[in-house]
Amino acid sequence: MEREDLESLANRGEYQALIEALADPQPFIRLHAVGILASLGEKVVPLLVDALDHHNPEVRKGAAKALGEIGSKEALMPLIIKLDKDIPSVAQFILEALAKIGDSSVVPILCRCTRHHSLPVRYSAVRCLGNLGDRRAIPFLIDNLSDTANIVRLRAVESLAKMEEPSLWSPISELLTDESAGVRAAAAKALGNMGNPRAVDALIGLLGSDVETDLLEAARALGKLKSRRALAFLKAAREREGREKVLKALDEAIYQIESDVQT
C-alpha cells in the first residue's frame, strides 16, 4: 500500500479500510493512516473507538493515537476502560491519547499509572503528567524520582520542572548524585531553568565531577543562576579542564555571572 492509496480511501469514504491500514507492515504507512484519520475528525470517532477492540495491537495503537489527535471528549471513557485491559505497549498510546484530550479528570488515572508494574506505562504516565502540568501530580512524580529505571527518573525530573513550584528544587537537587549521568544532567538543567538560587551549592558540587555532561550542565545552570558564589568554583574547574566543549561552557557561565555583577 502507498500513501496515495490511503488518500484515495479517505476520498471515497472507506474509513474502515483506513483503519485496517493501521496494521500495515510499513511504519510510515501506519503513521500516515493515523494522520488521515485524525484529519477526518469527529465523524470517525465511533469507528476508532470500535477499533480499540481490534485483534491487532498496531490497529489499537493507531486508533488511540488518532483519537488523541482528534481530542474528542466522547473517546475519554472508552480509552479509560481499555487502559487496564490492554497490553503495556498499547496502554502507552492510550495514556498519550488521554493526555492530549486534556480533560482534568484523567489526571488521577495518570497518577495511578506512575506506579504501574510496566516500565513503558510508568514512563508514559510520567511524561504525560509533565505535559499536563497539573499540580496534583507532584507527589507521584516525586516518588518516581526513586524509580528503578533511569529513564523514568529522568522524565520525572523534567516533568517536575514544568510544575513551576519553587520548592521542588530540593528533591530535584538530590538527583545530582544519581548513578546515571543522564539523570544528573537532567537535574542540573532543570535546576538552572527553575532559577532558584538555593540550588547553587548542590550545582557547585557537580563541578567536581570528571564526567563531561555533569560539567556542561552544571556550568550552564550556574550561569543562568548568576551566583557570585559560584565564580571561584567555575574558575577552578576551568583551570583543570582540557575539553574544548566544557571550557566553552565554563567560560560562558563565568561571563554571564561577571557581566551581571558589573551591571
Residue ranges and their predicted role:
Residues 2-9, 17-39:
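Alpha-helical segment of the N-proximal tetratricopeptide repeat
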Residues 5-8, 36-39, 66-69, 97, ...:
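Core register positions within helices of long alpha-helical scaffolds
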Residues 10-22, 42-53, 72-84, 103-115, ...:
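Amphipathic alpha-helical scaffolding segments comprising HEAT/armadillo-like alpha-solenoid repeats
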Residues 2-5, 33, 63, 94, ...:
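Conserved hydrophobic register position within alpha-solenoid helical repeats
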Residues 37, 51, 63, 67, ...:
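TPR/Sel1-like alpha-solenoid repeat signature
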Residues 150, 154, 158, 166-173, ...:
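Alpha-helical adaptor scaffolds
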Residues 25-26, 55-56, 86-87, 117-118, ...:
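Short inter-helical turns and helix N-cap capping residues of alpha-solenoid HEAT/ARM repeat scaffolds
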